[in-house]
Amino acid sequence: MNFLQFFIWGSWLCTLGLYMTTPVEDGGLAFDGALVGSVFALSGIASLIMPALIGVVSDKWVNAERLMGVLHWVGAISLFCAAFVTDYDLFKIAMLVNMLAYMPTLSLSYTVAYNAIDKAGLDRIKDYPPVR
């Protein structure tokens, strides 16, 4: 599960900078360095805010598996929309929505894994590292 969780992020994060700086004639967005940096800064902002908020929602109202699924769908839709956007402001909004949806799923994946380990009657300290 952790492999797939980080595979999602790595599948687009590695090439996003190149896509944003490539000229429009070559299929890119032709953003300058400051615009590219501001898009990448969204992940830091989202990672400070959203895990705590979604953690409260997960603890009180919605189970972690469902919430994680909904957030991954929101992220997928926002990335799909970002692929068709050429305007910087709209692209930044699409990436912000993606980051706001993706960042809490990192901690939710650990919650789901720990819950599965507990249900199986295993020890988290001893049995989680090999699973990871």
State where each predicted segment sits.
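Hydrophobic core of transmembrane alpha-helices in multi-pass small-molecule transporters
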Residues: 3, 75-78, 88-106
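Helix-to-loop junctions at the C-terminal end of transmembrane segments
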Residues: 49-63
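Structural signature of the two symmetry-related core transmembrane helices
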Residues: 66-81
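Residue-level signal for conserved functional micro-sites within the alpha-helical transmembrane segments
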Residues: 9, 43-51, 102, 106
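Helix-breaking motifs and short loop linkers at transmembrane-helix boundaries and internal kinks
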Residues: 62, 84-89
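Helix-loop boundary and gating motifs at the non-cytosolic
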Residues: 1-45
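Cytoplasmic helix-loop-helix junction between adjacent transmembrane helices
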Residues: 96-131
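Short helix-kink/termination motifs in transmembrane helices of multi-pass secondary transporters
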Residues: 7-15, 63, 104, 108
